[in-house]
């Protein structure tokens, strides 16, 4: 798809309504990983205190469009789902412009044996308050409740808006593609458990940071779970057929996928392999994998 000609491209720089309490401003950062761009959400009614979810990349044009759109408004909270470079860096400029509190996920932490963060994490992220699973912030006519959904990243949060039975899903559920799970910070077992956690909820609509709203959430999540189980089975089958390295598996499993996405696919295959190894189903010697 030519992202420049996608209907969403007309939305760049304009704050557009999604529901009575939700508006979206699309950043002009389309790519094979962000689809048409990062969707920055504004929650609340004009003239009252607002929350901004995922302010987006450190892009002057997007930040200017956001601050212009919110001129004369009161922003009480800047809410972060996770600390990737297309989601959180604009929080610094938006906080400086509005004085709002930065809240949401915890900063990524270092392990004893090295960084958990991947190359795309935001080192500038410094929240005023970290929200744990089930904790909420409030504004006039709205509540946002944190739902811890590790997997894409260890610190990923979704945010429920109970007034509209809506869930802001960040990158845990995207409206156009499956989510990349990239070790060491991404974890496939956590991702699958977090999808199952969403199945136990009764949200009516998802607002992903990338892509369009998901209006049949339960069906969509079941599809994502089935897709990942299918990929897991493909990994096991590939090893059984003698494809014992990740490059060989990716070439076979993702032959019909844009090759620009193959490095990300390799990270997700690695996440599957690590999960299978922990479960005692596969083993590795250096970069070669075998059935255990």
Residue ranges and their predicted role:
Residues 237-292:
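C-terminal regulatory/interaction regions
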Residues 48-52, 57-59, 116-126, 143-232:
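Metallo-beta-lactamase
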Residues 21, 66, 210, 235, ...:
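Residue-level signal for inorganic ion chemistry
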């Amino acid at each position: 798809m030519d992202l420049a000609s996608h209907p969403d491209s007309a939305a760049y720089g304009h704050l557009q309504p999604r529901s009575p309490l939700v508006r979206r401003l699309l950043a002009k950062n389309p790519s094979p990983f962000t689809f048409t761009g990062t969707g920055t959400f504004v929650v609340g009614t004009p003239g009252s205190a607002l929350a901004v979810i995922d302010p987006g990349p450190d892009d002057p044009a997007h930040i200017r469009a956001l601050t212009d759109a919110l001129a004369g408004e009161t922003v009480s909270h800047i809410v972060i789902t996770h600390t990737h470079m297309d989601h959180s860096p604009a929080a610094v400029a938006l906080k400086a412009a509005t004085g709002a509190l930065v809240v949401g996920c915890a900063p990524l932490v270092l392990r004893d044996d090295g960084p958990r963060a991947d190359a795309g994490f935001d080192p500038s992220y410094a929240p005023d308050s970290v929200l744990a699973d089930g904790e909420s912030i409030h504004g006039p006519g709205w509540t946002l409740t944190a739902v811890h959904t590790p997997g894409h990243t260890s610190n990923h949060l979704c945010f429920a808006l109970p007034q509209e039975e809506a869930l802001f899903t960040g990158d845990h559920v995207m409206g156009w593609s499956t989510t990349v799970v990239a070790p060491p910070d991404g974890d496939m077992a956590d991702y699958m458990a977090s999808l199952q956690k969403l199945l136990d909820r009764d949200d009516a609509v998802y607002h992903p940071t990338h892509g369009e709203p998901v209006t049949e959430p339960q069906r969509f999540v079941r599809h994502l779970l089935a897709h990942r189980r299918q990929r897991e089975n493909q990994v096991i089958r590939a090893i059984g057929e003698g494809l014992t390295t990740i490059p060989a598996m990716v070439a076979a499993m993702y032959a019909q996928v844009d090759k620009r996405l193959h490095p990300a696919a390799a990270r997700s295959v690695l996440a599957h392999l690590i999960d299978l190894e922990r479960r005692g189903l596969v083993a590795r010697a250096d970069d070669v994998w075998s059935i255990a």
